Amino acid sequence: MGLTKREEKILNSIIIPSENDPNKPEFPPDNPKFPATPTYQIKIPDFSNVWLKDESVNPTGTHKDRMAWEMVVTYKQFLLAKKGGAIKKLPKLSILSSGSAALAIQNQLKKYNLPDLNVLMDISTKKEKIDYLRKIGCKIFLIKLGNKILNWEDILNFTKNKDGFDVTSNEAYDLTVRFYDWMSYEIINSDADYIFVPFGTGQLYENILNIIKKELNYKSKDPRFKGNYEILKKTSVLGATTINPKSKAEKLYAPFLPFANYSKQWIKYYRFTGITGKMSSVYNLKEEFLEKAMDIARKQSINCEPSGISGLALLLQMKNKIPKNSKILIVNTGKTIMDI
């Protein structure tokens, strides 16, 4: 069938400078640079060398903008397939989201005149958030989410998109080394002894560890890696999550999500084979430390919300187990306009 004139124009507008050349980065699409977001030192009581990776400067305010760009890249592949006659029409995408990923993806789809996003949300989601997403073009589907893990088929069925693709799970995409690969290199290039990162869907956490594994195990090295291999071998990556359904870090509590392939056995294997540091794991947060982290963030004008700054909360919770003079990187995944 080929492409319409409109689709041909969209195809030509999606520019991908390179897959992994640090001198030809792909994100953010309007002004690509590597690193794409800043890392700067912050003051934390009792610690002397703490740095913040700040994703709040992204287009919609969170690290999900990186995932959103990859959706545009995916649509370029769809367009090329349609141009070659492999498919007859562009598929729609569906996602299970608390809001930030849906906002970021729809923002990019709208910018490139691509099909609007189908979004599955919990029926308890704030009306203001639902209204905002609808306003920018998302098609919202509300259900009561329980503890049952939803797979990609469930999500497509609930969003009435049986011929489309679910981008929540990792079954159709290589999420663990694709959505956040550039970001992961920016993170490990810091040569930190300890990296603290929010663990919601698990995609970012797993991506970081898989990039570390790739760098330590593969003979061919990625040109984006500028760090120290000896430090990387010992770097511990600590994920912050919660089992509290009433936590202010609401994006970290989602028992129904099709998580990335995180398991204690998997991370134990990485530790035992020398791929990651001894403290690499996912830890449950105590709510009191979220309050302390937010207080520190406010005093230093860090743009964040509780889920995004949960890595700092975990550091405060574990402060007696972390050497005070070690280099520490806190990943702030940011805050959207809907988190105000």
Predicted regions and their residues:
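PLP-dependent amino-acid enzyme catalytic core
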Residues: 1-340
